[in-house]
């Protein structure tokens, strides 16, 4: 899971 995109993953 990406660090900056972890919120956009879900």
From Swiss-Prot:
GO terms for cellular component: extracellular region. It is found in: Secreted. The modification Arginine amide is found at residue 10. It comes from the Eukaryota. GO terms for biological process: neuropeptide signaling pathway. Keywords: Amidation, Neuropeptide, Secreted. Expressed in the antennal lobe (at protein level). This is Tachykinin-related peptide 5. It comes from Acrosternum hilare (Green stink bug).
């Amino acid at each position: 899971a990406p660090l900056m995109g972890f919120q956009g993953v879900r």
